[in-house]
């Protein structure tokens, strides 16, 4: 492991026990203490480059002060423009920021854009309250506009500061003002969530020794047989997954120990977004005694390891990976896509996601392969799967799962190789196999759809899939 990876690991390992110290604290202790820890971590790891995050916060605060009722898109433009300056800073003879500064800046960008949207929603709710004489739902609306100091507290809260998960200001506010946090379980959920992490960590260390990424950049690698080159992307993506599985599980444990993002199960919370229905934070029975509620941590869940590995479709794989960020992308980017189409909307979203990750060409080459895979999936679903028997659907789904994993293996190479030259060289050495296969399957699906008899639209299965699609995008 590199020194930076060891530093990340130390931060993650320290966040879990630290959470227990803050769990039962007063709102002031939680607010100021968590921010103090976050500021200390930022200064220690980012040094003078900590100014980048401070400037971004100040700029966002000014936008909210000047344009409180329409601050979402200006904030999106401001934070993403600053990201471009941040990534190209060396061209201005300014020292390059540390990797930790980049991590802070990435998460901060998401939080500030979300905060601006929450401010807009606050004013919209107030207007609705005045015009309709009805009180709007409070489950997702912030109670007041945060001051500059409160914005700094939220932005530098040590929870999720560098590794995620992303969370909204309302989630943070609810944590500060939790009712009876001592009754919210932390230890058992933490142990349960932590169980697979050691296995993933050992697998990561072992696989990294036998399949180093740097080997792909050598001439010797390209002298190997085609099948070996093709196979190498499988362990590369495996190593990539194990590393992030460990990091995100530990990051979630840091939230769980502090009871951060804990809501009653009845709230039907979603990763990133929080509760989706009205819920009672405290319930009493007929005798007036407090009813013990069942809680979950879905709001801060950032990875579904089983879902990511064993879901059938490429589009489902995205939902199970970096889940809080996927919610942010769906909520603030996909829904505002200039073209209302799954493929074009996904392409727009993936372009923004690539830009958010960085300016390395490998990001764009990888992310912009996803819409092609989605188009192939949709084409084969329409042209073949819906016309076969139940046993045929099962076979189709197993083949689909295998190809989905190979598609992610292929795209991962661009994500880790980063440069255009290295990514293109590797993809060329395996004859752009996934691109060729995706285009072929897209065309095949179209041909099969033309030859197959038309089925009545809106069958029960299609309605169920559409309902699930809408639910996941809300």
From Swiss-Prot:
Segments on the Lumenal side according to the record's topology features: 23-33, 94-193, 261-427
UniProt xrefs under InterPro entries: LPLAT_7/PORCN-like (IPR049941), MBOAT_fam (IPR004299)
Keywords: Acyltransferase, Endoplasmic reticulum, Glycoprotein, Lipid biosynthesis, Lipid metabolism, Membrane, Phospholipid biosynthesis, Phospholipid metabolism, Transferase, Transmembrane, Transmembrane helix
Membrane topology of this protein: Multi-pass membrane protein
An annotated GO cellular component: membrane
Positions on the Cytoplasmic side per record topology: 1-5, 58-73, 212-230, 449-473
Entry superkingdom: Eukaryota
Location of the protein in the cell: Endoplasmic reticulum membrane
Pathway where this protein functions: Lipid metabolism; phospholipid metabolism
Main location: endoplasmic reticulum
EC supergroup of this enzyme: transferase
An example Gene Ontology biological process: phosphatidylinositol biosynthetic process
The enzyme's E.C. designation: 2.3.1.-
Carbohydrate-modified residues: 322
Role played: Acyltransferase which catalyzes the transfer of an acyl group from an acyl-CoA to a lysophosphatidylinositol (1-acylglycerophosphatidylinositol or LPI) leading to the production of a phosphatidylinositol (1,2-diacyl-sn-glycero-3-phosphoinositol or PI) and participates in the reacylation step of the phospholipid remodeling pathway also known as the Lands cycle. Prefers arachidonoyl-CoA as the acyl donor, thus contributing to the regulation of free levels arachidonic acid in cell.
Assigned protein family: Belongs to the membrane-bound acyltransferase family.
Name recorded for this polypeptide: Membrane-bound acylglycerophosphatidylinositol O-acyltransferase mboat7
Originating organism: Xenopus laevis (African clawed frog)
